[in-house]
């Protein structure tokens, strides 16, 4: 009787482990990337202020070009892990005409600028210098996790939103960017 109970208990524990290991060890990008703007949605416009453009320029002024927007922060461990991958994407696709825009949720301007400088993030960088949850852009783009990437097409519409840098790389590689 006890042997039968122990056998059932072990079988139950093994089954539970197998079922949960699919989610625990699995891909969390579906959960964190849920609720992002859908393909074809007009990208919410915003004005980007940088040291080189202190008067600012609108995201919509980049229509006619693909734009990759990366929502990130210097204090974010996942963003830090993806820095080299983002630099690789920039080196690969910026020469093909993709405009890269980093939107940071940093609140300390000096730390943010130091991270950009130390890591050679050579694309457009912008921050409202507000906490993530207080950012108007976080709300407009339904950001639940960082880094989050959006590819905007030449007409200003969302092609894809994702928390997976590799998925964005695959998408960019599938586009006919050489033919512009």
Question: Across the structure, where does each feature detected by a protein language model lie?
Answer:
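Bacterial Sec-dependent N-terminal signal peptides
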Residues: 1-30, 179
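N-proximal helix/coil linker or "cap" segments that precede and/or mark the start of modular domains
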Residues: 22-45, 60-63, 114-117, 174
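Thiol/disulfide oxidoreductase modules built on the thioredoxin-like
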Residues: 121, 129-176
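A short beta-strand-turn-helix
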Residues: 46-67
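Conserved redox-active cysteine motifs that mediate thiol-disulfide chemistry
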Residues: 71-88
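Conserved segment of the thioredoxin-like fold in thiol-based oxidoreductases
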Residues: 91-133, 143-146
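Short pre-active-site segment immediately N-terminal to redox-active cysteine/selenocysteine motifs
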Residues: 65-67, 71-75, 145
